[in-house]
């Protein structure tokens, strides 16, 4: 195979097919931004999934819209900045920033059009189910009277009509700000003017009307439609000649100076600057008159390619508010997470349960309460002398923060690493940091140039004449709310080696001293990349020597070129590579001569797949008791491997090893009901069970089957259904 050959992707009937392939050229990578858009399309496809209740389908539509907003605020904003600065450096797949923008705009245009079409269908289904969205013209006389009364008492006081003239310049519109633009004419002399009405951001988008007699249908009207009915109340003496809504999305990246004496004040200043970031996207109601649209564009300094004309509803992310309607028959049946019985076997003493044996808690199927309990018990336990904790994201009124504060107030040594650079949670984290400092917690902020993304909690307890270290590490945030909908793994252990490694990680973060003696864990940006490459290359060597060789990896994103190239090399050597990648995947699977032994699937369903699990056969194939199995906070992206503090933690206890490898990973690979198979061109197709094989839903399996490490004594009476994988590959339609 010549080193200067490249992958060529040919189009056939609208689908990309590999024509000739090798490893050298940039075409071996899928563009990161386009791969993300493919992922968001998979999310959107769940909004048309007939097996989901209609309010859940609305939720998926809202999620896809919210995802797209953040994509523009962060990714598109960054690429536009590169274009503005004249940067022409190519991405790993060979595209300049300007070329990427063209392809992004084309893909987003199709995606946005499909979102509106899906919403029109869902609106009809909602109407049939008794949830009716009224237009102003649909309202009856009595409904209009009620809306007017509601408007005058609950909306009118919040609105500020803004005439635009030399004395009243165009106001600042915040990111995601929703505004009605107006062309008005004065009744007395016909003089025209432009005006704006900014929609208040602190009230619900949808107004619920009272029931109509015996008809118990839920009737709703949007805030902007209700406002449009009574514009005369805001501009008396004027008539409306034209109107339309618009919404802006601004650059939300933070610019942080490298040198700063006070990191908190630095971030507070940067957050104020972010609120006034440049406009990246302008969404405009397609019914807005062209002259008014041009006026808004000029005022916001937006180019034509930054404007999206919307034939439908703006701010689709707010459709999630419809799911608050009390119609449980139109939602997924409620699910109550299990509490690990093994903790109950020890009278609720989580330290005793961990001392007995390592424990993996699988969220959201098993309750996050056990993580909260771990810290709360440490707070109350007089034998606990020290607690160390990382905080990347957490919830409002966080029980984690409260436990840390109470522990410090009780005289324990408490250290909290609060990451100020957690995107869109910066303000909340500044608030938590100050609350913790007031309680006596030693708060540190880690590295200015690195985000601390590791999930790590360490409790030191005096037991007799010795100190025992209890460790929790996981794949998800210390966030009780998202733990109900994100699939993640929490690992509890009192293994002295893991305890020493965890202490070294904290010392690295607080004291900047690079640890040279970590025993079992790997830590980015120091050793995690090296460990992953060693394992991948190890499987490659096994295959070349005729030994069993297999790699199973589960993550959110696969972007790093070195990791991808190592996986390509493994595939060419004959290693069986199975990847579960929810989001971005820049690797092209199934390409002859490059990646024919690599299969990639993405699972999209009721719960958001968030865990990272990395498994290597170690010369024994998979699954095997001899395999190397890790959980991690890190995805395989350059930022995680090089610009963040992350943890890769081995699972050494046989029970948790078996649980993660033979139960969790096998179930993920076995799933056919919620899985998409990734194709060489970066697109994906829904999977279906192979002929003769029963369909399998991974989320349903874990909702109905106990875990291996958490069952305790009851495992003998209630064992999880054992999973096996057929040798045949799942077939795509």
Swiss-Prot record:
Residues 714-733 have a biased composition (Basic and acidic residues). GO terms for biological process: polyphosphate biosynthetic process. It catalyses: [phosphate](n) + ATP = [phosphate](n+1) + ADP. Pfam families: PP_kinase (PF02503), PP_kinase_C (PF13090), PP_kinase_C_1 (PF17941), PP_kinase_N (PF13089). The active site is at residue 453. Mg(2+) binds at residues 393, 423. CDD domains: PLDc_PaPPK1_C1_like, PLDc_PaPPK1_C2_like. The keyword Kinase applies. Residues 702-733 are annotated as: Disordered. Its cofactor is Mg(2+). Its EC number is 2.7.4.1. Disulfide bonds: none annotated. Catalyzes the reversible transfer of the terminal phosphate of ATP to form a long-chain polyphosphate (polyP). NCBIfam families: poly_P_kin, PRK05443.1-1, PRK05443.1-2, PRK05443.1-4, PRK05443.2-2. This is Polyphosphate kinase. It comes from Rhodopseudomonas palustris (strain HaA2).
């Amino acid at each position: 195979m010549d080193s200067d050959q490249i992958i060529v992707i040919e189009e056939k009937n609208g689908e990309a097919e590999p024509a000739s392939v090798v490893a050298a050229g940039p075409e071996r990578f899928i563009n990161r931004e386009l791969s993300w858009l493919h992922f968001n399309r998979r999310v959107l496809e769940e909004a048309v999934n007939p097996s989901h209740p209609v309010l859940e389908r609305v939720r998926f539509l809202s999620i896809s819209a919210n995802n797209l907003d953040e994509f523009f605020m962060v990714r598109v904003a960054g690429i536009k900045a590169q274009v503005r600065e004249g940067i022409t450096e190519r991405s790993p797949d060979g595209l300049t920033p300007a070329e990427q923008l063209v392809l992004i705009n084309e893909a987003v245009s199709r995606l946005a059009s499909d979102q509106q079409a899906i919403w029109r269908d869902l609106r009809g289904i909602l109407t049939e189910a008794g949830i009716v969205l009224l237009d102003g013209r649909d309202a009856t006389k009595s409904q209009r009277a009620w809306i007017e009364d509601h408007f005058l008492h609950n909306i009118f006081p919040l609105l500020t009509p803004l005439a635009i003239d030399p004395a009243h310049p165009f106001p600042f519109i915040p990111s995601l700000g929703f505004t009605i633009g107006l062309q008005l004419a004065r009744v007395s002399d016909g003089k025209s003017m432009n005006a704006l009405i900014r929609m208040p951001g602190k009230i619900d988008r949808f107004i619920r009307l009272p029931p109509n007699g015996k008809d118990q249908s839920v009737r709703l009207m949007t805030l902007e439609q209700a406002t449009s009915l009574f514009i005369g109340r805001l501009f008396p003496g004027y008539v409306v000649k034209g109107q339309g809504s618009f919404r802006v999305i601004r650059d939300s990246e933070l610019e942080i100076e490298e040198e700063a004496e006070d990191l908190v004040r630095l971030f507070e200043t940067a957050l104020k600057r972010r609120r006034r970031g440049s406009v990246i996207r302008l969404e405009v109601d397609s019914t807005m008159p062209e002259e008014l649209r041009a006026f808004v564009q000029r005022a916001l300094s937006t180019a034509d390619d930054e404007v999206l004309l919307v034939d439908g509803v703006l701010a689709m992310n707010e459709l999630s508010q419809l799911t608050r309607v009390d119609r449980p028959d139109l939602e997924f049946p409620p699910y109550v997470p299990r509490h690990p019985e093994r903790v109950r076997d020890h009278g609720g003493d989580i330290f005793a349960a961990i001392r007995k044996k390592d424990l993996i808690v699988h969220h959201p199927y098993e309750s996050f309460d056990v993580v909260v309990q771990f810290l709360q018990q440490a707070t109350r336990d007089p034998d606990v002398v020290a607690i160390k904790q990382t905080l990347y994201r957490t919830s409002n009124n966080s029980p984690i923060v409260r436990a840390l504060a109470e522990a410090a107030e009780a005289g324990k040594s408490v250290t909290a690493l609060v990451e100020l650079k957690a995107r869109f949670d910066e303000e909340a984290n500044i608030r938590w940091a100050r609350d913790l400092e007031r309680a006596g917690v030693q708060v540190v902020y880690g590295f200015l140039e690195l985000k601390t993304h590791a999930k790590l909690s360490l409790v030191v307890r005096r037991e007799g004449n010795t100190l025992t270290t209890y460790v929790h590490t996981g794949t998800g945030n210390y966030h009780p709310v998202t733990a109900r909908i994100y699939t993640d793994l929490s690992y509890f252990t009192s293994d002295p080696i893991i305890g020493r490694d965890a202490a070294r990680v904290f010392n690295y973060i607080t004291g900047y001293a690079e640890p040279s003696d970590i025993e079992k864990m790997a830590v980015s940006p120091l050793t995690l990349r090296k460990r992953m490459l060693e394992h991948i290359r190890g499987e490659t060597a096994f295959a070349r020597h005729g030994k069993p060789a297999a790699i199973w990896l589960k993550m959110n994103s696969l972007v790093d070129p070195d990791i991808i190239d190592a996986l390509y090399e493994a595939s060419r050597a004959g290693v069986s590579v199975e990847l579960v990648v929810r989001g971005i995947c820049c690797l092209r699977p199934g390409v002859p001569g490059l990646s024919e032994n690599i299969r990639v699937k993405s699972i999209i369903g009721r719960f958001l797949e968030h865990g990272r699990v990395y498994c290597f056969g170690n010369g024994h194939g998979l699954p095997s008791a001899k395999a190397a199995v890790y959980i991690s906070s890190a995805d395989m992206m350059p930022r995680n491997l090089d610009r963040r503090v992350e943890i890769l933690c081995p699972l050494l206890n046989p029970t948790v090893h078996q649980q993660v490898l033979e139960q969790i990973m096998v179930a993920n690979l076995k799933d056919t009901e919620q899985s998409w198979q990734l194709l060489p061109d970066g697109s994906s197709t829904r999977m279906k069970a192979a002929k003769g094989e029963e369909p399998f839903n991974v989320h349903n399996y874990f909702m109905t089957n106990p875990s291996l490490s958490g069952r305790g004594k009851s495992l003998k009476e209630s064992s999880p259904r054992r999973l096996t994988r057929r040798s045949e590959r799942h077939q795509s339609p």
